[in-house]
Amino acid sequence: MKFQCYTLGCKANQYETQALERQLLALGHEQADRDCDLLIVNTCTVTAVADRKNRTLIRRLRRENPNAVLGVCGCYAQLKSDEVRALDVDVIGRSGGREAFLQNLLHAARERAPIVAVDEALRRPEFEELPAGGLAARTRAMLKVQDGCCNFCTYCIIPYARGPVRSLPLARAVALAEGLAADG
């Protein structure tokens, strides 16, 4: 199956998208620029402009690829799933639970049945470790060691979108960093 991923937003989203790409490649799927069977949009919702960019991209992808399975994940999908549902997407994933999102995408591609899996409560106490990867087309490798926030600043939506703060255990973070360093 051919796929393409699109990322809007922060470094955490970039890291999570790279992990999804690596997982799809490991399963034997092919990354492509066009004629894709599967399209994934990892979204941001930190501003109204970000929300508009999400909607614009999702609409364009649906219009240009009416037969592709379109999956949307990330903060916009988590907080504004009703808006995302209205955009004719096939799979909506929640923040955290990327493995379930990937399985739902592949199921939707096989069965042509839409799936919505948004966890409004975001009560995941554990850190979701995603596979660390090499540099790919980048000059620096990324390693996600923390997600979420508990500060609830009046101006910030991140605690609502990503849930409470969770961290990768220190020993595991060190081991992953050493592995990335050994890979160059």
Regions found by a protein language model. Give the residues of each.
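Proteins enriched for Cys/Gly/acidic motifs involved in redox and nucleic-acid/cofactor modification
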Residues: M1-G184
